[in-house]
């Protein structure tokens, strides 16, 4: 990819999120390019969208130009995946940091939550206090400000037998299909509209109510983990990322 095309893409990103939220200077990018514990590598830009629509527009621009997209939230570096790893990629890399999109919606009287892209375990812990509940992770990740979504995508947790690793079948996410086209997949269990822009705007604005929530048998956690992890004589791995019954969607 030519320098001119990279410069053109940077201009598009600035138009979407503003100059202050598109980082291109080496020194300023360093905190995003290196995980606190694991992973490091160069990106030509770090962009920090302020809402879900900005995030969608950034994804469209980056996918159209064929650059590598690395999604990043708190960047703890606990499991890797939130930074480049080395500098031998075949295409330029852009990091999309989601920490400005940090809202959490409590639904069904606090029985469930919808965490937006940059929501953290810190915030979730505070919101759940009045319901006498705790986040899915309270041992390690909470103490360093890890994100909710990063935990789900990177299979974190599993130390607490009653909760198991982070896992859900209920999510709203973007993916690039086999034809290279970006598409928005709504498996959240909430009727938010028909097109990506409408869906994302309604979600962020909380423009939905109990009638829009679809109650189904989909899981937001592994309800069999506490039994499986006790099967010490089993030859089947108990850990989530080796358990094929829980692989799908964002998990």
Language-model segments: residues:
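N-terminal flexible segment immediately upstream of the FAD-binding catalytic core
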Residues: 1-60, 77-114
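Short conserved micro-motifs on helix faces and helix-strand junctions that flank
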Residues: 48, 72, 115, 146-148
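Glycine-rich, histidine-containing beta strand-loop boundary motifs that form or position
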Residues: 71-75, 82, 98, 117, ...
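FAD-binding subdomain of flavoenzyme oxidoreductases
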Residues: 105-107, 117, 121-122, 126-251
């Amino acid at each position: 990819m030519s320098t001119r095309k990279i410069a053109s893409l940077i201009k598009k990103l600035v138009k979407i999120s503003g100059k202050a939220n598109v980082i291109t200077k080496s020194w300023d990018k360093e905190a995003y390019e290196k995980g606190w514990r694991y992973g490091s590598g160069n990106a030509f830009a770090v962009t920090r969208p302020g809402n879900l629509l900005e995030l969608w527009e950034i994804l469209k621009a980056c996918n159209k130009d064929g650059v590598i997209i690395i999604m990043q939230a708190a960047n703890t570096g606990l499991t890797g995946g939130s930074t480049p790893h080395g500098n031998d990629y075949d295409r330029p890399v852009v990091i999309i940091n989601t920490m400005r999109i940090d809202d959490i919606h409590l639904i069904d009287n606090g029985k469930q939550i919808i965490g937006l892209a940059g929501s953290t375990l810190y915030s979730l812990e505070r919101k759940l206090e009045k319901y006498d509940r705790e986040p899915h992770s309270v041992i390690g990740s909470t103490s360093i400000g890890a994100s909710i979504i990063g935990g789900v995508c990177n299979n974190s947790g599993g130390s607490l037998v009653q909760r198991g690793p982070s896992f859900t079948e209920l999510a709203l996410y973007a993916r690039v299909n086999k034809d290279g086209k970006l598409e928005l997949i709504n498996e959240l269990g909430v009727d938010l509209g028909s097109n990506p822009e409408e869906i994302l705007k309604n979600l962020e604005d909380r423009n939905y109510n109990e009638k829009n929530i679809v109650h189904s048998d989909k899981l937001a956690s592994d309800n069999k983990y506490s039994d499986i992890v006790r099967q010490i004589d089993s030859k089947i791995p108990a850990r989530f990322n080796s358990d094929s019954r829980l692989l799908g969607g964002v998990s």
